[in-house]
Every structure is written in structure tokens, then in C-alpha cells.
Amino acid sequence: MATYHATTDSDKLCCHKKAAPVNSAKISLIIPVGPDDSSWNSLLEQIALFQAWFAEIWLITTSTDSADFECWTRRFSDSEIIHWVHTIIGRGHQLNTGARLATGSWLWFLHADSRLSHDAISALSTALQSDHDSIYFFNLKFETDGPTATRLNEWGAWMRSHWLRLPFGDQGLCMSRETFERLGGFPENVPYGEDHLLVWQAHKQRIPLRAIPATITTSARKYRSDGWFRTTIRHLWRTAAQSLPQLVALLGSRLR
């Protein structure tokens, strides 16, 4: 696999890539990978089953060790669609980097610890054929690697995303390139909640958010390692702290 170096305004990228024609009607899958995160291996195992459906797969990582990735390229029938990119730490920056490099007309931002199903892929495929202007998200389910109390968090995520129209990044946000560019990308100057702030920006621009009638699963390991109550309260507090000024700004723009 060939290697090249590309330079952006903010950093240098090291990518493992082969040039390949891409069907722009397909999806570019963008997966940010954090330091010492190996959960993407299990995700790629699932993605390999649906690889024909993607224009390309971008793993945007802060690690320079691509040994495991090189092994994965041999498990894809077309190794040219999967790419490994090294960039600086920061989830918002990683997501924007993937979007800049992607060539598909649809951008699907997926967490490395997400788990997919055939039903989820099929439901998203159907939805994308009917509406090109919305941001799509899935229902959320937690894996069994955490406390059983995370079932309450699933319920809370459903209410937040369906009633308040505030889905988070672990619900697999997918949108057209035009919509992403209209939003201006993910904010990079925040310590957390870049996905949350992007959704608020969508509300300000009256961009619809639509639920996919399917579920993706995410890891509950943080609820186990940090404690269910502590983690839940921390998420609620951070969400409220970010939401209040955004809500005030949204109401202000509506009243002008």
C-alpha cells in the first residue's frame, strides 16, 4: 500500500492510501480513533461485511502505529477503499479532517466503539434515497459491557433525540456533503460536545434531523469504569451547560 503525506493549514497528515475511482453516490465512512483505542478492530470486522456499500472508509487516528491496520487491508476485497490517517488529538479536528479527505457525496460519522447490523445499513440506505437535506441518526443501544442501568440511558437518549431533536455523535450522524459544508463542520475549539454543537447549528439553520428506524450499539465501558451515576450526571451537566446558551441564541434568532 502506497504512502503519501499531505499538508493542511493546521497540521500534516500521514495517510496510507491507494488512488482509486470512487462512486460519489456512495457513503464516505469517517471514524475518529482516540489514543490507545483498539475498538475499531471489531467495527472493521463488521464493516468488511458491507464494504461494497461504501465509497471509502477513513480511520482518523492520533496513533502512528498502523500495523493492525495493514493487516485489515488484506481482509477487504478492495483494499483501496480503506485509509489510515494520522493527525493531531481532538475529535472535532479528526472529524473535519476525515470530511476534507472524503470524496463521497454522503458523510457518515461513526464512533470507533459503534457496532452495526444489516438492519441499520439497510434502513440508512433507504432513507438516503428520499431526502438529501436532513441529518440522519440512529436509535442507541448499549452493549452488555457496562451496568444494566445503562438501559435508562438508552431511554434518555431516545427522548433527547426524538423529543428534543438533539442526537449525539454515538448515534451515527450521517449527512450530505452539502449539508456538512453548510454547517461549517464540527467546532474544533471545544473540549467536548462538538457533535452536540453541530446539531444546535443545524437547528439554527432549520436543517431537519430525522431518526433512522434502526439501532446501532455502542460500548458502555465508561459507565463501568467511571461509575454509572457519576458518568450519567457528568453527561447531563455538560449537556445542560452547552445547551443553555445555544437555546438562548436559537430563540433570539427566531424572534428577530
Residue ranges of predicted features:
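Hydrophobic helical membrane-anchoring modules
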Residues: 2-11, 15-23, 203-256
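Short, well-formed alpha-helical segments that are part of the catalytic scaffolds
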Residues: 35-50
